[in-house]
Structure formats: structure tokens, C-alpha cells
Amino acid sequence: MMAAFVLVKMTASGGWEEINTLHMALHAIAGVKTVHFVAGPTDVIVFAEGADQATLAGTIGNIRQTQGVRSTDTRIVWPV
């Protein structure tokens, strides 16, 4: 199992309707476990898991292609 935190910047100003739409769209992606809207330079933090690297990469690609996502910055979680 592989996991990642994906830091997302939104394209829109972040009105409630846009936030709700993006929240639902991100939650609908296979592999996405949690979606948190946060204050600061990052608008959203997504936690995602995949059975292997290819599956996780596919999930991250789907996050990037979601309408309302301007950019992403991914942090792979290393098991310790």
C-alpha cells in the first residue's frame, strides 16, 4: 500500500458553491480517503492511497484533472 498527501490550489476564489463542488468531486475519486479545506497558501489537502505506485499515480492524475484544481504538490508517505 502506498499513500500520499496532495496539496491542492484551487482555480476559483473559493466561494462556498465552488468549495462544495470541488469537495464532492475529489471525494468521488477512487483512492481518495480524506479531503480537508485549509487556510494558507494551500487550499485543500487530500490524503490518497493506492495498492501500488501505478494505482496511486492514477489517483493523483485524476486529482490534477479535476475541474477547479489549478495546481498540485504531492508528498509521498514513507513507511517507517
Please name every model-derived segment:
Residues 1-80:
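A compositional/biophysical signature of low hydrophobicity enriched in polar/charged and small residues
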